[in-house]
Amino acid sequence: MAREAKEEKDEVTVCARCHSLRNYGQVKNQVAENLIPDFDFDRLISTRLIRSSGSANASVIVMVVDCVDFDGMFPKRAAKSLFKAMEGIKNDAKISKKFPKLVLVATKVDLLPSQVSPTRLDRWVQHRAKAAGAPKLSKVFLVSAHKDLGVRNLLTFIKELAGPRGNVWVIGAQNAGKSTLINMLAKKEGLKVSKLTEAPIPGTTLGILRIGGILPAKAKMYDTPGLLHPHLMAMRLNRDEQKMVEI
């Protein structure tokens, strides 16, 4: 009886869309899916960063990029939007100490050839990010959520940057692996938080989600919808082919 009560308590209610994605790897209604508007990064993220820069709380941007398709997955428009926003406030002495910090996370490194050294990959990632218009990086992390590589070090660094009351925004192109990474961060903390829906279909996350438990109680982490990028390889695959891609 006690076991049944515990199992019932641990169950998490999900919407029909997430249930379909988790269990069948497909959306429930493709017609309705096509009507969902693209995520407005400039309005919903960049403007918030500008407003929060004047507060006492730190702002951290975790940009997740699939290193297997780095140039295709790098959110250039968002990077340029951040660069423009940060350039506009960096000379303001009142808020320069709380300048948003950008951490770049190159995911799925386990899928690269073994002869690609971490040092060489780190330099290449920084070079490509700068060429794509990214602001100054606080640090680059090479991780694999699937193989549990680099996740603990990333979590420690994010906590240090965010402090006790900071805001952490996890951004990236559609299907870059943001939700998978956040689930691994939660696992590192030994948390029983609601698992974010993971699926090979681009655009799984629809709105900004606050993730509790990973950071200190008064700090906040947000998962954001995947950014649409015209050069994504995944956008050239049909539904059956997308299911064959490792998240």
Name these PLM-found stretches.
Residues E11-V14, F74, L121, G150, ...:
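Helical mechanochemical/support elements of P-loop NTPase systems and associated helical scaffolds
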Residues D66, G163, G212-L215:
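Loop/turn segments within WD40 beta-propeller blades
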